[in-house]
């Protein structure tokens, strides 16, 4: 299984070679998918995450993953059941808020790429011991943000992070300047309230 995970690390290197910001979408209505698809295509955004926080989340993944320009990830991934459902609707990778044996085993048996969520050195060590080197650092700003990531670089030189939680237009460039930050993830580019309001003009302005 570890060899499969090591190969998966290379998958993420390919996904995020040129795109260092991962938009996080929370979609309540399916018709939003078409508008968001247009906006992403206009702005060269190919990789993004749809969270499993709404009733239509899996349908939204299914709709947007049918566009061959997109690599759609599933967020808020927590159980083996989540994994199976996500794979069935076309998700190409998963991102979790934390770690568990069920999550690791479910992703590994299905060769499903995972960015596990970590918040402590212990969780980093557990993930690294299974071969995971690309990790979600969550919730980033609450855990110390920039300074915490700098502190983690020494003991974990082989790990790289996707800080998530509190990342915004004012601080994302500072995070990206860190050598152990692979990319940043956040909803500031596509705020849920603007999606719910269908304020596509404002979202275009932000992006």
Predicted features, each with a name:
Residues 62, 150, 173:
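Active-site phosphate/pyrophosphate- and oxyanion-stabilizing loops and adjacent acidic/basic residues
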Residues 26-29, 74-80, 96-99, 116-121, ...:
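Glycine-rich beta-to-alpha transition loops that act as phosphate-gripper elements at the mouths
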Residues 1-92, 109, 169-170, 197-207:
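Conserved N-terminal beta1-alpha1 strand-loop-helix module at the mouth
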Residues 36, 79-89, 122-130, 147, ...:
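Catalytic cores of alpha/beta
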Residues 41-46, 67-70, 87-94, 108-115, ...:
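Glycine-enriched alpha-helix->loop->beta-strand junction motifs that scaffold or abut catalytic
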